[in-house]
Amino acid sequence: NISSIEVEAVLLRHPSVQEVAVVGLPHEKWGEAPHAFVVLRPGATLAEEELRAFARERLAGFKVPKGMTVLPELPKTATGKIQKYVLRGGRTAIAAQ
């Protein structure tokens, strides 16, 4: 089991990351693997491999997100809570927005 909170805390330390949510997405080999949905700081750029390298230095290999999707914002409730179920269920639709 992987704690998304632990992975998110590490990724938030990257200077380009403003917000992040990590969810488990289907994976052929492991059944489910961590995937990072990232909102970048204004003017920042970040390649997926750069974020993975950053995470690899700070996390066990199996906890490093296997993928990354950059979004303009994370889906949230009216009270500001991140809607991870939306990210899990609509990765393709969200990425297209």
Model region roles, listed by residue range:
Residues 1-63, 69-75, 80-89:
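AMP-binding/adenylate-forming catalytic core of the ANL superfamily
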Residues 89-97:
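Acidic/polar alpha-helix N-cap and adjacent early helical turns
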